[in-house]
């Protein structure tokens, strides 16, 4: 009979075997590719010595194709919980050194367990994906595992923040778990996501494409819009995840952490008074407006490489987290198009789900014209913005800096779509269409058309007609934007808005 000490030594041996993953050679190969192991990634993600691993000794039950002879340490996935900046977070990290991180029945069961724990505790979950896909030997059991993970992703949506991290291959059905989460991080040159890989595409369509061009970090950050962030390397990626979590609440019943940023809430920035060109058709950088108004000029852009005609980012005003949606006049004059509508709508809905106030900076001349846009469904996609803003019950503040024309003005959270406070700069032009274009229609047959057009532009290319009708709450100097927004946020802190009871709405997807 073994002694107590021998039993303790046996535990240490078993733990060492699990922590060794797929063995020294496979770990070396992982490092040679510029990738950390699953446990190294989790150690970087969590506060020092805070990570608690669960289910180290779980084993697969497959007896087909010689699998019964295989020992797969930890079932190829590390799961557990710890703290990030002192706050509880759950995580899983697939271990590519063990059977390529392939997903089988018990691998999936470990992931589902931490998903459910995260829901019970009201804590965010981070999933690090690095897997060759389904464990083929386990057949339908592996497929069922994916289905259970997808179900938990959907169940947790809007309740706890879910962050997916792609740090290697993520192919086939595996891609849908990240797609169901709130944010996806990818690492340049080492991350790939695709449903069918280059070899299958070549055999079916004849197209030749590399894995990086097909599903690499920049393909999904700038072309498809599937991913939200692209990191230079794994260290950078993990640092960004920790930074993002600082802007978010732990769950939908809490508020985001209030941070003492040290920036004066009454600060005015004189540079804003001279930022806009005198010619309203000339571009400027809306990021300069954001940087001049938020705490310490610091903001974290979401999808910075996708649909760059609109900016979505997290920032703080007087220490309070906000989500910012802003037109970018430097790109396509700030017009809304299909991709910009999708990008902003999803961001609006995330902010609303997690009690994060929304601040809008508006300079929008209209929806982008063109057959590609019309045939691509700009009506349906643009309607998503109208729906998302109308549905949102968090504080909504709109700052109109210049153009606000037609349906695009409404789509950028006008008072009619539920904006709680609308501020306008003196440079604002709020109208059904551009004043010059409107005048050309109204005075088309008049002999003194030019004089009447000039007078019309002078009278209507201002915020004052809208203010006279109550569509603008306050006309402010540009430099007053920061204190105005902070005052509005303080006033709206106790906002409560009730809607008609329903199972759920039918957003125009």
UniProtKB/Swiss-Prot annotation:
It is found in: Cell membrane. One of its GO terms (biological process) is sodium ion transport. It catalyses: (S)-methylmalonyl-CoA + Na(+)(in) + H(+)(out) = propanoyl-CoA + Na(+)(out) + CO2. InterPro entries: AccD/PCCB (IPR051047), AcCoA_carboxyl_beta (IPR034733), ClpP/crotonase-like_dom_sf (IPR029045), COA_CT_C (IPR011763), COA_CT_N (IPR011762), MemalonylCoA_decase_suA (IPR005783). GO terms for molecular function: propionyl-CoA carboxylase activity. It comes from the Bacteria. Completely inhibited by avidin. It is an enzyme of class 7 (translocase). Optimum pH is 6.4-7.0. GO terms for cellular component: plasma membrane. Residues 267-503 form the CoA carboxyltransferase C-terminal domain. SUPFAM superfamilies: ClpP/crotonase. Its EC number is 7.2.4.3. Disulfide bonds: none annotated. Residues 4-260 form the CoA carboxyltransferase N-terminal domain. Belongs to the AccD/PCCB family. Carboxyltransferase subunit of the sodium ion pump methylmalonyl-CoA decarboxylase, which converts the chemical energy of a decarboxylation reaction into an electrochemical gradient of Na(+) ions across the cytoplasmic membrane, thereby creating a sodium ion motive force that is used for ATP synthesis. The alpha subunit catalyzes the Na(+)-independent carboxyltransfer from methylmalonyl-CoA to the prosthetic biotin group located on the gamma subunit. Can also convert malonyl-CoA into acetyl-CoA. This is Methylmalonyl-CoA decarboxylase subunit alpha. It comes from Veillonella parvula (Staphylococcus parvulus).
């Amino acid at each position: 009979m073994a002694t107590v000490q021998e039993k303790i030594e046996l535990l240490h041996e078993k733990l060492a075997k699990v922590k060794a993953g797929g063995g020294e050679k496979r770990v070396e190969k992982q490092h040679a590719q510029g990738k950390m192991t699953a446990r190294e990634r989790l150690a970087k993600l969590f506060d020092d010595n805070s990570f608690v691993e669960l289910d180290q000794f779980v084993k697969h039950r497959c007896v087909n194709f010689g699998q019964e002879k295989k020992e797969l340490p930890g079932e190829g996935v590390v799961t557990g919980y710890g703290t990030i900046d002192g706050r509880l977070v759950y995580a899983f990290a697939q271990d590519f050194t063990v059977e390529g991180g392939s997903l089988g029945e018990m691998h999936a069961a470990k992931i589902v367990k931490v998903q459910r724990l995260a829901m019970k505790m009201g804590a965010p979950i981070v999933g690090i994906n690095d897997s060759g896909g389904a464990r083929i030997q386990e057949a339908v059991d592996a497929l069922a595992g994916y289905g259970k993970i997808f179900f938990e992703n959907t169940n947790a949506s809007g309740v706890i923040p879910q962050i997916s991290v792609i740090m290697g291959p993520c192919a086939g059905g595996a891609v849908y778990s990240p797609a169901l989460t709130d944010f996806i991080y990818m690492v340049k040159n080492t991350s790939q996501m695709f449903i069918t890989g280059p070899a299958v595409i070549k055999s079916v369509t004849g197209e030749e494409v590399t894995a990086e061009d097909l599903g690499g970090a920049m393909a999904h950050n700038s072309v498809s819009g599937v991913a939200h962030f692209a990191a230079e390397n794994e260290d950078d990626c993990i640092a960004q995840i920790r930074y993002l979590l600082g802007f978010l609440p732990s769950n939908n019943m809490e508020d985001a952490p209030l941070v003492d940023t040290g920036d004066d809430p009454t600060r005015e920035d004189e540079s804003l008074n001279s930022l806009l060109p005198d010619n309203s058709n000339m571009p400027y950088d809306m990021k300069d407006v954001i940087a001049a108004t938020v705490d310490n000029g610091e903001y974290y852009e979401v999808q910075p490489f996708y649909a760059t005609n609109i900016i979505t980012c997290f920032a703080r005003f007087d220490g309070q987290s906000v989500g910012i949606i802003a037109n970018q006049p430097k790109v396509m004059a700030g017009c809304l198009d299909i991709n910009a509508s999708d990008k902003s709508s999803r961001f609006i809905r995330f902010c609303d789900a997690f009690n994060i106030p929304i601040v809008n900076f508006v300079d929008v001349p209209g929806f982008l014209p063109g057959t590609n846009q019309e045939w691509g469904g700009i009506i349906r996609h643009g309607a998503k913005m109208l729906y998302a803003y109308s549905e949102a019950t968090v504080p909504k503040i709109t700052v109109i800096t210049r153009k606000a024309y037609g349906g695009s003005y409404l789509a950028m959270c006008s008072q009619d779509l539920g904006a709680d406070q609308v501020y306008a700069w003196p440079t604002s032009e709020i109208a059904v269409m551009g004043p010059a274009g409107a005048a050309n229609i109204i005075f088309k047959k008049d002999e003194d058309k030019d004089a009447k057009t000039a007078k019309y532009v002078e009278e209507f290319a201002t915020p004052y007609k809208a203010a006279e009708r109550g569509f603008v709450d306050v006309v402010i100097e540009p430099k007053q934007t920061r204190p105005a927004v902070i005052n509005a946020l303080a006033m709206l802190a106790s906002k409560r808005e009730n809607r008609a009871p329903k199972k759920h709405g039918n957003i125009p997807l």
